[in-house]
Amino acid sequence: MQLNNLKPAAGSKHAKRRVGRGIGSGLGKTAGRGHKGQKSRSGGFHKVGFEGGQMPLYRRLPKRGFTSLTKAFTAEVSLRDIERLEAAEVDLLVLKQAGLVSDLVKSAKVIKAGELTRKVTIKGLGATAGAKAAIEAAGGQIAE
């Protein structure tokens, strides 16, 4: 086998359909577009979501919710992530250096996902009730 002998598998390649090239091709005259109407004309397509002048679905349904402006600046950190860290004291700077949170993050919260088996001190981070209990059960503490 050599590179110049390679061929695509049989039936895997199809010739491009040439439309408007005579009736014998099966796609002559109207080129598969039918007769008259907007879709038969050049440039004759409507924008996505247009329903022929009827009030479109995206405008019939009510607006819901909003985009939180603080979402990009807050983060969640699991006990599993903290367990992997070498540090005995964990604060926002340690999390950023470890790549667990983005540099944009201004506050983080520890959530109870995974287990903590060693003593660790959490500084300046929030924690859920379950996470607090798990940290204290492992001999650690949460300093505000």
Curated annotation (Swiss-Prot):
Alphabetized InterPro entries for the sequence: Ribosomal_uL15, Ribosomal_uL15/eL18, Ribosomal_uL15/eL18_sf, Ribosomal_uL15_bac-type
UniProt keyword annotations, A-Z: Ribonucleoprotein, Ribosomal protein, RNA-binding, rRNA-binding
UniProt-listed NCBIfam families: rplO_bact
Domain of life, source organism: Bacteria
GO BP terms in the entry: translation
Protein name as it appears in the record: Large ribosomal subunit protein uL15
Listed Pfam families: Ribosomal_L27A
Function: Binds to the 23S rRNA.
Species name: Cupriavidus pinatubonensis (strain JMP 134 / LMG 1197)
PANTHER family linked: 50S RIBOSOMAL PROTEIN L15, LARGE RIBOSOMAL SUBUNIT PROTEIN UL15M
Self-association and partners: Part of the 50S ribosomal subunit.
UniProt region (Disordered), positions on chain: 1-48
GO cellular component terms listed in the entry, alphabetical order: cytosolic large ribosomal subunit
Family to which this protein belongs: Belongs to the universal ribosomal protein uL15 family.
Keyword ATP-binding listed: no
Sequence ranges of Gly residues compositional bias: 21-31
Alphabetized GO MF terms: rRNA binding; structural constituent of ribosome
